[in-house]
């Protein structure tokens, strides 16, 4: 990549990366701005639940990043970062591309954490990105002909866990007994009381069991 000036590079194109890039551009900085991600599309995570239910299509929540940054003066580069040499200010990529930067912003987001619990990575589904969503959809499709209800456990009673439980109950209450496992003594521990009360009403209406003060020690294969 030929650059006359060392760029400001943002690694990661989630909400943080995109907003940082667009807001920095408003300052009319006299250096190139490059945003880099291994994926070609942005994922609007708050609507993953609606994609799961089929209320909206997957393409509606995954706009193309080149399109987002077209005519913005920001360069989007799809590539996978392998190493950062902080002493030399150099980024090294999967295809042997090296970029020397002037400023670096790391906004690579989060990944799931199994907390070293045995069997989690092998026997659980996650809900953090499009690949997770696709895997969960395939599993749910495979349960279409279930003769009896299975127990479906969701670990974590934060906003994501509660919303996912409600959505799955709306779609598959005839296939699953849905239960939420939470290690704390209440759901939505960081939310306002009103939000907790409304969430409890939604869960109670759907007859979703909440197992508080409960931790997972191991996850085994379904028998």
Task: Label the model's feature ranges.
Residues 1-5, 9, 73-151:
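FAD-binding core/adjacent interface of flavoenzyme oxidoreductases
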Residues 55, 59, 118, 127-130, ...:
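Short, conserved loop/turn and helix-capping segments at secondary-structure boundaries
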């Amino acid at each position: 990549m030929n650059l006359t000036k060392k760029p400001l590079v943002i690694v990661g194109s989630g909400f943080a990366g995109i907003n940082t890039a667009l807001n920095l551009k408003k300052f009319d900085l006299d250096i190139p701005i490059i945003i880099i991600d291994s994926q070609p599309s942005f994922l609007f995570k708050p609507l993953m639940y609606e994609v799961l239910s089929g209320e909206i299509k997957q393409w509606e929540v995954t706009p193309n990043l080149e399109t987002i940054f077209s005519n913005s003066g920001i360069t989007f580069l799809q590539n996978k970062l392998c190493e950062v040499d902080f002493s030399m200010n150099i980024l090294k990529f999967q295809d042997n591309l090296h970029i020397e930067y002037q400023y670096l912003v790391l906004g690579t987001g989060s990944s799931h954490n199994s907390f070293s619990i045995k069997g989690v990575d092998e026997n659980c589904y996650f809900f953090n990105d499009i690949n997770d969503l696709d895997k969960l959809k395939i599993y749910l499709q495979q349960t279409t002909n279930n003769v009896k209800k299975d127990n479906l456990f969701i670990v974590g009673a934060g906003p994501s866990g509660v919303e996912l439980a409600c959505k799955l109950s709306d779609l598959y209450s005839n296939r699953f007994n849905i239960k939420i496992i939470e290690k704390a003594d209440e759901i939505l521990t960081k939310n306002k009381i009103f939000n907790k009360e409304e969430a409890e009403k939604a869960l109670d209406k759907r007859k979703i069991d909440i197992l508080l003060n409960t931790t997972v020690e191991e996850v085994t294969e379904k028998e």
